[in-house]
């Protein structure tokens, strides 16, 4: 429920920097400067020319992935009002399906293909349906400047309600009103909750947040009559309850207090909240607030406390479901609404990661569980909150693949006296003393990069690669404290952990191995920072939309989502924090050395990490490195922070092929 907008905009700063001095001309906010576009196209031509050398590897990967196509277990459909719904892709295009509950004949509710096929980038944000009205948000250029579209399913007529909004959308039960979050024109900060009359297009601002380091958002309540609207920064929350039909907004559930977070939901005319009011997150309950009367803190009654806090909760007709963690094991517990525990069971099974998917609405009493490991195909299970039983729904089957041929394990590496977990996998009969390592990392915002099962990763294992994920500080592997140890002035800890993981994996199992790195977005900070620390530790790297110009990005609060990110990256207006940021900033720390080969991918319309960050970074590497690379820049002129799903697989094949070509060359030289 917490906001996850990150990396909107790059900012010019007066900080002295060779990189900035030499390559600031690559920044073009209009994305129309012919000199810049010509440079990016020339770099693409250079990259495409080099990629021809290993085109056979790229095509082989695509063929392997195609031949390994799974007999997919059906993903559970969303349950709403006794109907099942599924937004899926067919031949690459989005289509919305529905059926009666329990696997009746499906029907096409809406086919997005005509909207999608005429564009080189197309992404759906969220969709809602009430009766014959379908409301969705769409991004048509990768800029994440969504627009809301209302469709009359009887006639098929579609019309745009509003543009330059966030991706979220809600539709009132009577379908007469839409709810969106409008963005500031210049900064793209989500700052207004806007209610739109779907018949007249009349707009009304329900709540505007003027504090520049706060963001606005909303989510539906378990009780379909309501939504929770909120404003929050990195550590503080303010929420109100909205009646979707009437548009009536309650007073704040609790006035904002620095460091106090709470996330509420509504059921049975009561409000339940997960809050760190008393330190650890715990569940509280209170009565529905009146319109103009603030909820007194004294009216919050404790509902559930746990030694390590409550991670999340969900409300169903049959009870409240809570997730807690003990010894890094997550537990699902079901409680009656009078607070009595009805059932408790582990979320994960041995060796697998698992997470909940709330695809069932309040009355369905169904919650879905997705689980897998790096070498075990995905499994869908369903937990019935009413009868308290768990059943298998489906599992992906990969013919010719046997989990017994592979090893998936977790090791601990020491970094500055701290034990850092690393998930890794390899194929048993391919493990040799010089088997190379591909190391992936992210390490920010408290996100945990789960060790997913992916055919693409398995194809690397089949070619003798050890694939690893470093769960560095700054991520969420060990909870909130693990995040705190790698954010702000402690951000360098994330990079130190990644370097320590690479050093340990270089000699994993007594071997002498080449290490290759992959990182996306904040993971680019991690990889680029680690390469600055030890360029000779890495044999190659792939960075996708990398956040590498940190001090510059965080030095101008007038541009997108800068002040909101001080807690994560540091505040350059404070001398001590600026010093810490300068110490890890990837561009500021490029120096004369033999940097490894790199492939950097950027999206021209990216509003989170603008294209010029990666372009400036690689230009500086190319001009400074004492090695010959190659240093390849690839710009997607039709996407932003994410690539269009229709091109994503081919792009991933090119990235893996780049690394495999380096591995092949290295082995030939040994």
Cite the ranges covered by each PLM segment.
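Solenoidal tandem-repeat scaffolds enriched in leucines and small polar residues
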Residues: 167, 171-241
């Amino acid at each position: 429920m917490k906001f996850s907008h990150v990396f909107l905009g790059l900012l010019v700063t007066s900080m002295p920097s060779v990189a900035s001095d030499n390559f600031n001309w690559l920044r073009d906010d209009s994305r129309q400067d012919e000199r810049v576009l010509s440079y990016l196209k020339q770099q693409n031509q250079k990259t495409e020319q080099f990629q021809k050398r290993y085109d056979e590897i790229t095509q082989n990967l695509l063929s392997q992935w195609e031949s390994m196509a799974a007999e997919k277990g059906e993903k559970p459909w969303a349950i709403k009002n006794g109907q099942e719904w599924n937004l899926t892709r067919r031949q690459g295009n989005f289509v919305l399906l529905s059926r009666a509950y329990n696997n009746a004949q499906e029907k096409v509710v809406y086919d997005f293909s005509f909207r999608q096929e005429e564009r080189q980038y197309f992404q759906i944000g969220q969709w809602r349906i009430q009766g014959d009205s379908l409301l969705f948000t769409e991004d048509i250029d990768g800029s994440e400047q969504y627009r809301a579209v209302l469709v009359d399913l009887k006639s098929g007529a579609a019309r745009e309600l509003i543009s330059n909004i966030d991706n979220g959308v809600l539709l009132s039960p009577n379908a007469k009103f839409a709810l969106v979050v409008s963005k500031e024109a210049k900064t793209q900060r989500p700052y207004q909750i806007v209610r739109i009359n779907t018949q007249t297009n009349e707009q009304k601002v329900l709540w505007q947040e003027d504090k520049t380091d706060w963001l606005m958002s909303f989510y539906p309540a378990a009780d379909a009559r309501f939504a929770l609207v909120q404003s929050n920064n990195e550590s503080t929350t303010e929420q109100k309850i909205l009646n979707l039909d009437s548009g009536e907004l309650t007073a704040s559930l609790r006035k904002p207090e620095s460091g106090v977070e709470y996330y509420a939901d509504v059921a049975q005319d009561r409000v339940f909240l997960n809050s760190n009011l008393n330190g650890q997150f715990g569940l509280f309950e209170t009565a529905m607030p009146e319109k103009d009367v603030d909820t007194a803190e004294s009216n919050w009654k404790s509902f559930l406390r746990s030694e390590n806090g409550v991670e999340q909760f969900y409300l169903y007709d049959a009870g409240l479901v809570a997730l807690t963690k003990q010894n890094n094991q997550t537990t699902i517990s079901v409680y009656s609404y009078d607070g009595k525990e009805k059932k408790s069971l582990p979320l994960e099974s041995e060796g697998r990661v698992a997470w909940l998917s709330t695809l069932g609405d309040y009355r369905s009493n169904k919650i879905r569980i997705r689980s897998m490991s790096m070498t075990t195909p995905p499994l869908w299970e369903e937990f019935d909150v009413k009868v308290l039983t768990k059943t298998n729904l489906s599992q992906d089957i990969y013919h010719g693949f046997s989990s017994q041929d592979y090893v998936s394990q977790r090791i601990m590496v020491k970094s500055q006296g701290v034990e850092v977990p690393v998930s890794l996998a390899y194929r048993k009969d391919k493990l040799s003393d010089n088997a190379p390592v591909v190391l992936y990392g992210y390490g920010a915002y408290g996100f945990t990069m789960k060790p997913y099962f992916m055919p693409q990763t398995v194809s690397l294992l089949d070619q003798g690669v050890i694939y690893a994920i470093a769960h560095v500080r700054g991520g969420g592997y060990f909870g909130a404290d693990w995040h705190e140890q790698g954010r702000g002035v402690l951000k360098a800890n994330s990079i130190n952990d990644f370097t320590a993981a690479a050093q340990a994996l270089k000699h994993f199992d007594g071997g002498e191995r080449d290490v290759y790195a992959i990182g996306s977005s904040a993971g680019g900070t991690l990889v680029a920072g680690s390469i600055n620390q030890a360029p000779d530790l890495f044999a190659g790297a792939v960075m996708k939309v990398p956040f590498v110009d940190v001090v510059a990005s965080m030095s101008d609060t007038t541009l997108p989502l800068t002040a909101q990110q001080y807690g994560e990256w540091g505040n350059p207006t404070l001398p001590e924090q600026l010093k810490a940021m300068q110490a890890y900033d990837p561009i500021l720390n490029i120096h004369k050395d033999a940097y490894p080969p790199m492939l950097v991918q950027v999206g021209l319309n990216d509003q989170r990490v603008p294209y010029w960050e990666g372009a400036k970074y690689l230009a500086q590497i190319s001009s400074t490195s004492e090695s010959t690379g190659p240093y390849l820049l690839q710009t997607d002129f039709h996407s932003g922070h994410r690539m269009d799903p229709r091109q994503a697989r081919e792009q991933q094949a090119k990235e893996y092929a780049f690394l495999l070509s380096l591995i092949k060359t290295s082995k030939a030289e040994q």
